[in-house]
Amino acid sequence: MKILVIGVGMYVTGRGTNTFGTIFPSIIEFQRINKIKKFEVIFAGRNFSNIQKSKKKVLKALKISKIDLSKINFKVSFYPNKKNKKQTYKDILKNEKNLSCAIVAVPDHLHYQVINECLDHDLHTLAVKPFTIKTKDARKLIEKKNKKKIFGLVEFHKRFDKHNLLLKNAYDSKRLGAPLSFIVEYSQKKIVPEELFKTWAYKTNILQYLGVHYVDLVYFVTRATPVRVLAIGQKNWLKKKGINTYDSIQCIIEWKTKSNIKFTQTLSVNWIDPNNSTAMSTQKIKFLGTKGNFESDQKARGIKIVSDDTHVEEPNPDFNMAFQEGNRTEWRGYGIQAITQFLSGVRKIKNKNFINSNYYNKSKEDEFFKYFNFSSTSFEEAAISTAVLEAANKSLKNNSNWQKIK
């Protein structure tokens, strides 16, 4: 199995943080369990400097995981591999043989371009959120994916969080009644736009980078259709720092269920939380129904750590946590699961040789999809949140007017 990872930033390797990210630890755990005989991970970065920093992270992660490379084949390659050499993911796509799949973790505005080229090379592709920024681009990718009989997923890991699965179970069982409103508060530390994403933060906004998770979640829980959206944003702190993007955005989305019941989702998102906040993300969701309520504080997971060496911490052991097992490190959580299930699905699909058969077609998509976790987000489903983002961005540019969602 040969995996191409496009992007080597914070979420991939933990570059710029004291962690190892989520994508590479997920790949480690996948290979630890499966012990695939021929296994290679190819990292494609933007420049040699970033690759060198990420390479140190990757090699250290392998070391502390105590994977015995003499018993488990685990080859890693990095491009560009020489200073002043302009090797890109395009060169790898063109020249590398027998790639199994691609994981795309690049800045938001590059998603369409990179995913499109992966599909051009017949690669099953997992992309981090958001899927695309424009609905027309989402449609093009869906059409190409279906025409080529390959598979595409978007890594909306909030669907795998047991907090949210409990909400879905309660909703599906009709214990909460008909939906009236969803209220979401979601924010991250200033370090994210100011340092970690400084080179491209001005090309995105907090709604499409972060808030989109909970747009997708409302669709996942209710299977409702978004009807219209209104968005209001504030530019203050980040603009003074020379980053021309919104500090905070408030968004109201009107949804309609299959039984024509309308309800609203209110999103309040920002990425200017103090850097000494007790967690990277502050996140709360409240569902109000005609028969009951559901509340989830997804920052306060019931754990608080205080020590002389660090400030107060409230870790989230459910997302992606490094645990010590004897003398080795293992990573567990729904963030890990969202990626390992994609890799497991690709492996099963490859073994079934779906691409070279007539098995995959529109009418049998559910059969094809069974090789993935039911929480997985297909390109088709991810296009729902893309449509909301596109309308919300139009609202921000048009005096916060209501915008119909196509």
Kindly label every feature range from the protein language model.
Residues 101, 107-159:
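Beta-strand-loop-alpha-helix segment that lines the small-molecule cofactor/substrate pocket
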Residues 22-32, 55-60, 165-171, 251-254, ...:
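Short, well-ordered amphipathic alpha-helices
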